[in-house]
Structure formats: structure tokens, C-alpha cells
Amino acid sequence: MAPYPNWLRNSLLTAWALALPALAMVVPAGTQLQIRLKTKIASNTSKPDDPVETIVIAPVTVNGTPAIPAGVTLRGVVTGASEATDPTVRATLALDFRELEIGGQRIRVHTQLTAVENARESVNDKGEIQGILANETLSSRMDSGIDKVAEKYSGFGGLLSAAKKAVFKETEGDISYDAGVEMDLKLTAALTLTGPPPPGPDAALQPVADPRALVDLVNRQPFQSRAQNPPKPSDITTMMFIGSQEQVQGAFADAGWHQASKLGEKSKFETMRAIAEDRGYSEAPVSILYLDGRPPDMVFEKINNTFSKRHHLRIWLRPDQYQGQTVWVCAATHDTGIDFSAKDRIFIHKIDSQIDLERSKVVNDLLLTGKVQSLLMVDRPNVPRNGQNATGDNLTTDARMAVLVFE
């Protein structure tokens, strides 16, 4: 029998391929999504069915395979909102994120909010945001103390009350999130995606010019900063940046990070106000840590609406160069709460011990800006996997350093 002509064979193969179902990937229920608001929402102004738009800010993988890239759009609506009508009533805000736009498709998703990043509010087991009670804040407790003084010394109590009102603003209990606030969700039902995922921000990355030289450079760097008071080892470095100061500052600004104020009397006073009023302070100062005896050259942070929680990092200029470019190293941690040190009589932050999560946070934020040219993860065999910072928090890391080369 004569063989099939090429045109017929190719036509049959094409028809067979078109008849196959598109390659599908199932993202299981329980998978976490990290998102960033593009829409302002508030318990006292938002209404049911108001649209809410966000972007996914961290890639989602399934068994190591890319599924949902960072940068895709996730849309939702407000499903409920109630005001804090007085200091004893909690504001509430409920959201439903239900449509993922990916690869030119709009796909129905089922999600539940699990956390609002660095927020003073909490999220209950139904995914509803619960506001604070204004009468439970430090400012309100100060009012109670002044009232007790006024019971014995009416004139003095009035003087204290007037002084307090001149310094501190009344705490508002309503929930208000600007564009840029970040949230965590979980899928409540499996999500089926067809076809390959669209490229994420990492698709445009270029290989580093001389990886061996970069590995040597990384492993020559000091790996742990030191505090001055008390003089103890502190944060472990987890990132290196290659580029000018302007490039580094521009990338962090585009990623929504703020430069911290210098530690001084004015910033200390503003910190005290932020704690008392239970609000954010986007340029809050950080304690000074030293690397090779030098204080940080740049400090950035990302805060929502409370001083007690924040992403923050310190960056030190190094004497080295790579491919003729400036070299910086960075230590980043996530403050998850605040405590008072009776010994030092100061407020101190408690941190998430898994510092590699903060490294991933920073890397993902910077990749989304489109200003990173190359990324390399470098092993550091001489860096310990476990340690402590100067205030006694545990530190756990895989010891790798993320090296980002800026465009």
C-alpha cells in the first residue's frame, strides 16, 4: 500500500491534536494567594457590591510547577460593611474575591480572606475583617487614668486631659485600607487552569554575567549585623543588591516601600503617638544595627495601619564592586508584634523567626517593579541555619543569599 501523502498525514496529526483536551492544572483548595489592593476600601464608605480590584503579588506553584504568576488581576466585591458607631462597637468589612484574570481568561474562583498584612484589625474564621474597639486602645486607657486623677484633683485632671488632647488624636475604630494594602487569601475550592500559565515578572530576567565571581563575592561578605546596645549579634543578611543608590531607592519606591526616618527625638515622639493612637507610621525609625562597624546606609519599611507590625530592612554599602557596579547587602525581617523591655525601658518589636519568608517577600516585590535585570540564589555553606537577634528572637534560614542586579 502506498504511504499517506505528507499533506494528509499532517492534517490528521493537526486534527488529532486539536481534539485533545487542553493541558489542565489543578490548584488545590487551601492554596494561599497573596494580593495587593488597587482599590481603596473602608467600613464607613464602602457599600455592598462595590468592586474591589487587586493584583497577585507572589507566584503560586503546584508541586514546584508554576500555576499563577505574580502580576495577574484578581477581582472581587464588598459583601458587607458596618461602621464603628461608637468606641464600644467594632467596625466590620467583608469581601469576596471571585474572578481571576489570567492568560486572557476570566475564571471564577472561590476564596476566603485569612489575613490583612500588618493590620491592627483581625480576620475571623468566616473571613470577615473585625475592627478594633477604640475604647481598648492605649489612648483610651490614658483617658481612664486621667479620669481617676480627676476624681481626686479635679483641676489637675482637667489640665492633664487638655494636654493629652493637644498631643494625641482620638483613635478611630473604622476600617480603612488604601490601595497598596496587602492581604492573604486561601482557595476554598480547587481551581482548574487550562493551558500554560502566562509569563510572570521573572520571565524577563537575564543570566548574571559572571556567576562564579558573584558566588565568591557573596561568600566574602559578613553574614550577621551587630547591635550596639546591647553589643550582640543581630539580624542575618539574606540579600545583595547590585546597582546605584538611585536604582535601589527607585525600585523600593515603586514597590511601595518607604524610607525610614532617622532615630531622633522627633521620630521617637511620633513613634509614641503612633503607639498611643494605634495607627501606622510609614517612616517610623528603626534601631541601628552595624555591619563591619558601619550603620546602614538605607532603611526601608512597609507598614499598614499599626506601628506594631511592619516589613523592614537595612541596607549597607560594601567596599566591593561587581562588573563595575556598586554592591549592597541587606538584612530584612518582619515585625509581628510589640513588647516593652523592662530592662531597657523601651518598646521592642518581636519578629517572625522564618526570615527567608521576608527575603521572598522583598524579592517578589522588587521583581514586580520590572527593574530587576538578574536574580541569583547563592548558597553560603559557612552561614549558620539558626541563630538569634540582639533582642532574643530566634532566626531560621536556609542560609542562601538572593542577589538582585538592577537595570
For each feature predicted by the language model, list its residue ranges.
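Bacterial N-terminal signal peptides that target proteins for export
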Residues: 1-16
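Boundary at the C-terminal end of the N-terminal hydrophobic targeting segment
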Residues: 19-24
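Contiguous beta-sheet cores, especially beta-hairpins with glycine/small-residue-rich turns
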Residues: 25-199, 261, 265, 270, ...
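Second-shell loop/turn segments in exported
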Residues: 64, 173, 233-241, 345-353
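Compositionally biased P/S/T/G-rich terminal and signal peptide-adjacent segments
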Residues: 203-230
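Terminal, regulation- and interaction-focused segments at domain boundaries
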Residues: 221-251
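A cross-kingdom signal targeting lumenal/periplasmic-facing segments of multi-pass membrane
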Residues: 265-407
